Amino acid sequence: WSKPYQEAGYDVRIITLPEYDVRTYIPPENVYGILAAPPCTEFSLLNCKAEPRKRDEVAGMEIVNACMRIINQCNPHFWALENPRGHLRKYLGMPKLNFQPWFYGDPWTKATDIWGNFNIPKRKFENWADVPTLDLYIRPNRDKPNFAYLHKSAWSKIPQLQFHKPETDAEFRAMTPP
């Protein structure tokens, strides 16, 4: 989701493991904007029966708090922190924006929250029927693909995700378009 800023000439820095750890990152001066997308693993609403595990919201909040520390330290003109709709609302309150990717042209559902100080983008689509589609799996008795139920094999069908080939289904489902 930083790609439009990079294409517009901004100095974009991707702060993610293994190159950088947001918990220890020291930002440069004069940061104009921040886009943060902490891992959703600890905050997801999905009940993954195939891989039962206890959520560690404390560990998840370490990353969120590190993002917020950087945002507060930099005091940028705009900032946005993105995560799929889930338990993060317990800690950050209601988001400024909740949307479905198909509102903006990505042909799937994945309820997403964004907190921050930013201009809410105008929706490109009001009706699902108007969204250009891809050949993606649709669960029985549903009318739209749900990103949470797609497998990594769907990666090859999604042009906007070609920047990185995921090794696992979980890695695929955690991807944020550039």
Model-flagged regions — what are they?
Residues W1-P178:
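Conserved active-site and SAM-binding loop architecture
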